[in-house]
Amino acid sequence: SCGFSTTHVPLTHPVAAAKQAATIDHISGGRFGLNIVCGWFKNEFEMFGAEWRTHDERYEYGVEWLDLVRQLWSHSKEFDFDGKYFNAKNLWSEPKPLQSPFPPIMNAGGSPAGQHFAATQAEMNFVILRDHGVEGGKAQIDNLKEMARNSGREVQSWIHGYVVCRDTQKEADDYLEHYVRAKGDYVAVDNLLEIFGMQSETLAPEALDTFRFHFIAGHGGYPLVGTPERIVDEIGKLMEIGIDGIL
């Protein structure tokens, strides 16, 4: 895949998304994927005048949204759709995606409802490893893949990470500290925390500081910090617990 586009399903009509995605799949020569976000930031819903639904209902909406998209990608003739959230007639979309049967779907659901959505609907789940370590990650990934197998599917687990590679571990650690502590844009991160509702009133100071550090270091990704050998070893550990890819 050459890259993913992200769509917020409550704010994008599935007919438009299906046509846009199929077009991009042709432009990219069949190297396109669609990252689906079921929505969580209420301000965005208000900006678009979209209905604010409960957490689990947003995933239910996402299932129907994706069902309609996939039908548009597969039906050769016009069809009608009568669902809980969408009702449409004379639906039709050409060209169909190059990839068969469909472009891959990614989702970053981490809650029980989100994990179920990813396991039953997506080809890839974007995993946030707890505590930035592999210890608790295996259970997360095993649970996701078991849910997928129980639905007759296979799903990959992906993470995002950041790399600080130097000749020695100390040089890597020192450089990480330098660009985070001395060069980091803490004003921007604090603005982000406020937008996310993660202020000192809701999180302990230590948790806030950890979030700030890893966000500046690499958008909160998994730290791959050290010598080339150390980083290769760490990637190997991630593969052992079931990680299929790193962005």
Regions found by a protein language model. Give the residues of each.
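Non-cysteine beta-strand/loop elements that form the S-adenosyl-L-methionine
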Residues: G33-G39, L208-R212
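Structural motif
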Residues: I27, T120-Q121, I241
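Acidic/polar active-site rim loop that often engages polyanionic ligands
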Residues: K42-W52
